[in-house]
Design a protein with these regions (language model features):
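Alpha-helical scaffold segments that mediate packing/assembly in large oligomeric complexes
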Residues: 1-37, 152-157
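Flexible, active-site-adjacent loop/turn segments at secondary-structure boundaries
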Residues: 1-4, 17, 55, 61, ...
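Long, contiguous amphipathic alpha-helices that act as assembly "spine/axial" helices in icosahedral shell
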Residues: 1-13, 36-51, 117, 121-142
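Hydrophobic, aromatic-enriched interface-forming segments
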Residues: 19-62
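Sequence/fold signature of self-assembling virion shell proteins
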Residues: 59-157
């Protein structure tokens, strides 16, 4: 859900392109340059890719990714570092259709927990023990004055 909100609210949405092993590096560098031109800080950037895009990146001779990532970062989903951005691989089923890649700064979007409520029922009828019921409501927002910190590249179908 959060990636969908970020894709819709992105400040940079160039025309869809067919990503190949020959052009993937140039497209990512274009994204980085666009964020640089809008004075987005170079620290705390994240490059979100699908497994298919990650495969193209691995096949590209121009990309040399720093893959010596600590265990703590791997637990968070970071698989590499490219041009100073943490590279995060996300399953295509969790991303919008035709998702190529997204380069974003952490200050451009927030994903708050709006509601978190739990109830415990001690020994309810039919159950021996404690029954816990709960609900959690999440949301996501792209800040209007920070939307230039998101570059979303769609791929051609």
């Amino acid at each position: 859900y959060v990636y969908g909100v970020m894709a819709v609210g992105a400040g940079h949405k160039p025309a869809a392109v067919a990503l190949t092993k020959d052009n993937i590096y140039d497209e990512i560098i274009k994204a980085s340059a666009a964020l640089d031109d809008d004075l987005v800080p170079e620290t705390d950037r994240a490059l979100t890719v699908t497994p298919a895009t990650y495969l193209l990146m691995k096949k590209c001779k121009d990309i040399v990714m720093e893959t010596e990532i600590g265990e703590e970062m791997r637990i968070r989903g970071v698989i590499a570092n490219l041009d100073g951005a943490m590279t995060i691989k996300v399953a295509a089923s969790r991303l919008p259709e035709n998702f190529g890649f997204m380069l974003s700064h952490k200050s451009a979007c927030c994903a708050p927990t709006q509601l978190e409520d739990y109830n415990e029922h001690k020994n309810p009828p039919g159950i021996n023990g404690t029954l816990v019921e709960g609900r959690i409501v999440y949301d996501a927002y792209v800040f209007e004055n920070k939307k230039k910190g998101i570059y979303y590249q769609e791929i051609t179908a």
